[in-house]
Amino acid sequence: MNYLKELIYRIRGEYTTEKLIKMGMRVGENFTRLNDVILDPAHCWLIEIGNNVTMAPRVHVLCHDASTKQFIGYTKIGGVKVGNNVFVGADTVILPSVTIGNNVIIGAHSTVTHDITDNSVVVGSPAKIICSLDEYLGKEKKRMKNSKCYGCLLYTSPSPRDRSV
């Protein structure tokens, strides 16, 4: 089955997480890579992903930026480091030379152009901090508890973040 999966990925020009790890990418435990996530295959050895990281559909992690090549003859290349306990929303682009701290939520359709500090929630293009993780989680717990939304569950078991405190 793994051979068939690998063959399909190769035909489509995509790489499995396992293949990228063999090519030098570093990944911690509990990494969830949803559909159509692109992890720069040409520079995957510059990507480091921590524990408990989720990348929603169509996230792009790029370690190169060729926007300057036509004008000055050089391509910018830089590593991307994603900390522990990070959620990256759908259609987000993470550009080269960026470090994302621990305990971070990145909203959908964001463009991460600079480092993100620990315990932050960021959104936008370019991504900007909108609040601390604790503020966001407090608001969301209250909202979910008081709303009648289908599929909203308030988990009472501690998250990996809570267990480390």
Where are these regions (language model features)?
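Flexible, solvent-exposed loop segments that connect beta-strands
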Residues: 68-74
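A contiguous, mid-protein "functional segment" used to position or interact
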Residues: 115-153
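Extended, small-residue-rich solenoid/repeat segments and analogous flexible loops
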Residues: 1-39
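Left-handed beta-helix
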Residues: 29, 34-35, 50-51, 56-57, ...
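Conserved small/polar residues in nucleotide/adenosyl-binding loops
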Residues: 155-162
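Conserved H-X4-D acyltransferase segment
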Residues: 41-43
